Amino acid sequence: MNEQSQAKSPDTLRAMVAGTLANFQHPTLKHNLTTLKALHHVAWMDDTLHVELVMPFVWNSAFEVLKEQCSADLLRITGAKAIDWKLSYNIATLKRVKNQPGINGVKNIIAVSSGKGGVGKSSTAVNLALALAAEGAKVGVLDADIYGPSIPTMLGAEDQRPTSPDGTHMAPIMSHGLATNSIGYLVTDDNAMVWRGPMASKALMQMLQETLWPDLDYLVLDMPPGTGDIQLTLAQNIPVTGAVVVTTPQDIALIDAKKGIVMFEKVEVPVLGIVENMSMHICSNCGHHEPIFGTGGAQKLAEKYHTQLLGQMPLHISLREDLDRGTPTVVSRPESEFTAIYRELADRVAAQLYWQGEVIPGEIAFRAV
């Protein structure tokens, strides 16, 4: 231990680290890390500064930014030769719509919705779920798009069928680390679902409540597109924590996205923000970026309804090819720029869920990542 470090008490070291962290700013932080009480542990050993943070939402991508921006300052002011960073989670269980009772084992339900089909809602839901898992969370997906259940195909699990360990409940299908269920596991491609709204809604509620979900931090709910009876019924009856609305920059998609936001507001489901999908087409040959569906629409929509633009997702052939193969980009290309974008989206969604919500005491589980 050098003289500089000997002169520092544990309280002094902690104050130095806390002061540096207090200056760190990031889109996922409504308040700074010190105010959030994220600094869990500071220690000194063999000229190495050990810093552990505990966050109430997934934050791994932002954590990498923190290390990059703050390490040099901490080395300079503490005299340490190295820093050992550690991130752990206390994933918070947040208040559900209308204080409904939760689903056994599930902390938070995130509804992914769109006002119309064809905007990439399901692909966004799948990659968001995988990105949340990649950030360190326990995640599940329920495919509520009963008339077009595409999640099994996107996850390469279309040939699997759920089992019932007790004759009453279904065990979820595990795929790429996600616990999943879908009406697509129960019917063949040749059998179209012709149920009316009430029957479809009842079936989906049964799937949600009678699936033996493992302990999940986040359950991503891939909603049916549109704002009709079935969507309204699901939004009213499922204990959702928050909703994400997916759109494209195209004017007609934005019109329908408005309807989705208004629907959630009417049933008192917090809208976490908007995801602008296909915001930029990227040529696979030359890399040229072109906004073929227009620009700026989702940002204006977010401002009008006082919500967040959570992310702008590109349109690239590899994203489609990966889904067609049943190996979404987040798992098949973990180091790609597209995966980085989805992981940043996951951080923003989880953070917005936390900042907009109300923590339910006694429903927080500690877990290191």
Curated annotation (Swiss-Prot):
<comment type="subunit">
    <text>Homodimer. Holo-ApbC forms a mixture of homodimers and homotetramers.</text>
</comment>
<dbReference type="GO" id="GO:0016887">
    <property type="term" value="F:ATP hydrolysis activity"/>
</dbReference>
<keyword id="KW-0547">Nucleotide-binding</keyword>
<dbReference type="InterPro" id="IPR019591">
    <property type="entry name" value="Mrp/NBP35_ATP-bd"/>
</dbReference>
<dbReference type="InterPro" id="IPR000808">
    <property type="entry name" value="Mrp-like_CS"/>
</dbReference>
<dbReference type="GO" id="GO:0140663">
    <property type="term" value="F:ATP-dependent FeS chaperone activity"/>
</dbReference>
<dbReference type="GO" id="GO:0005524">
    <property type="term" value="F:ATP binding"/>
</dbReference>
<dbReference type="InterPro" id="IPR033756">
    <property type="entry name" value="YlxH/NBP35"/>
</dbReference>
<protein>
    <recommendedName>
        <fullName>Iron-sulfur cluster carrier protein</fullName>
    </recommendedName>
</protein>
<keyword id="KW-0408">Iron</keyword>
<keyword id="KW-0479">Metal-binding</keyword>
<feature type="binding site">
    <location>
        <begin position="115"/>
        <end position="122"/>
    </location>
    <ligand>
        <name>ATP</name>
    </ligand>
</feature>
<dbReference type="InterPro" id="IPR044304">
    <property type="entry name" value="NUBPL-like"/>
</dbReference>
<keyword id="KW-0067">ATP-binding</keyword>
<keyword id="KW-0378">Hydrolase</keyword>
<dbReference type="Pfam" id="PF10609">
    <property type="entry name" value="ParA"/>
</dbReference>
<dbReference type="InterPro" id="IPR027417">
    <property type="entry name" value="P-loop_NTPase"/>
</dbReference>
<keyword id="KW-0411">Iron-sulfur</keyword>
<comment type="similarity">
    <text>Belongs to the Mrp/NBP35 ATP-binding proteins family.</text>
</comment>
<dbReference type="InterPro" id="IPR034904">
    <property type="entry name" value="FSCA_dom_sf"/>
</dbReference>
<dbReference type="GO" id="GO:0051539">
    <property type="term" value="F:4 iron, 4 sulfur cluster binding"/>
</dbReference>
<comment type="function">
    <text>Binds and transfers iron-sulfur (Fe-S) clusters to target apoproteins. Can hydrolyze ATP. Both activities are required for function in vivo, but the ability to hydrolyze ATP is not necessary for Fe-S cluster transfer.</text>
</comment>
<dbReference type="GO" id="GO:0005829">
    <property type="term" value="C:cytosol"/>
</dbReference>
<dbReference type="GO" id="GO:0046872">
    <property type="term" value="F:metal ion binding"/>
</dbReference>
<dbReference type="GO" id="GO:0016226">
    <property type="term" value="P:iron-sulfur cluster assembly"/>
</dbReference>
